[in-house]
Amino acid sequence: MSFISNPNIHFYLLAYFIGGIPFGYLLSRFFYNINLQEVGSGSIGATNVLRALKERDPKKAKMMAALTMLLDALKGALVILVAKMAGMSVETQWAIAVLAVVGHCFSPYLKLEGGKGVATGLGVMAVMLPLEAAIGLVVWLVVGKTLKISSLSSLLGLGALLISSFLIHPEIPEIGTHAPLLIIAFVIFYKHIPNLVRLFQGKEGRVV
């Protein structure tokens, strides 16, 4: 089978380019003429959407942030679901999951800049490891509600998802390794390094 006609390659490209769609950037630009890369943390995710819009349109800021999060999660989940319906192997589905998150974090439409990967990561995990994704989501919600620090709640939720995955599945079904999950976790952690620096300096902003 040639490179061009290989359906796996088609899905890998689809995952990266759909994962790279910067919904937060597009929504803020289209409705408010705000360039998310020039405000707040410069990220294109829901948290920065909320921060950027709070002063401009406080009544709709949370709604736009929630919409951004939903779209970012769906773009990761939908590509995998289509791959499942097309009969792609579990190995291919995991590769798609990784590439969707990489696409979001290093978007081809924004000169390889992007978001933190949390919502897209949650979307792909909801399909691949739904129980672990639910555990991570609960931790993220509880910590976020209590401490109101988005980066910390995201990383603790990620940690909970990782730990629970090893406890529930010592070997990930059908692939026998946690490697794709660890790659996704590494990418998300890497994108949060500036947040961790600010956190240790006491400069990380809270989200109200």
From Swiss-Prot:
Localization of this protein: Cell inner membrane
GO biological process, one term: phospholipid biosynthetic process
InterPro entries according to UniProt: G3P_acylTferase_PlsY
The entry's keywords: Cell inner membrane, Cell membrane, Lipid biosynthesis, Lipid metabolism, Membrane, Phospholipid biosynthesis, Phospholipid metabolism, Transferase, Transmembrane, Transmembrane helix
EC number: 2.3.1.275
Pathways per UniProt: Lipid metabolism; phospholipid metabolism
Reactions catalysed: an acyl phosphate + sn-glycerol 3-phosphate = a 1-acyl-sn-glycero-3-phosphate + phosphate
Class of the enzyme per the UniProt entry, highest EC level: transferase
Membrane topology: Multi-pass membrane protein
Transmembrane segments annotated in the record for this chain: 7-27, 63-83, 86-106, 123-143, 149-169, 170-190
One MF annotation (Gene Ontology) recorded for this entry: acyl-phosphate glycerol-3-phosphate acyltransferase activity
UniProt xrefs under Pfam families: G3P_acyltransf
One of the record's GO cellular component terms: plasma membrane
PANTHER family documented for this protein: GLYCEROL-3-PHOSPHATE ACYLTRANSFERASE-RELATED (PTHR30309:SF0), INNER MEMBRANE PROTEIN YGIH (PTHR30309)
Subunit text: Probably interacts with PlsX.
Family to which the UniProt record says this protein belongs: Belongs to the PlsY family.
Function according to Swiss-Prot or TrEMBL: Catalyzes the transfer of an acyl group from acyl-phosphate (acyl-PO(4)) to glycerol-3-phosphate (G3P) to form lysophosphatidic acid (LPA). This enzyme utilizes acyl-phosphate as fatty acyl donor, but not acyl-CoA or acyl-ACP.
Protein name, per record: Glycerol-3-phosphate acyltransferase
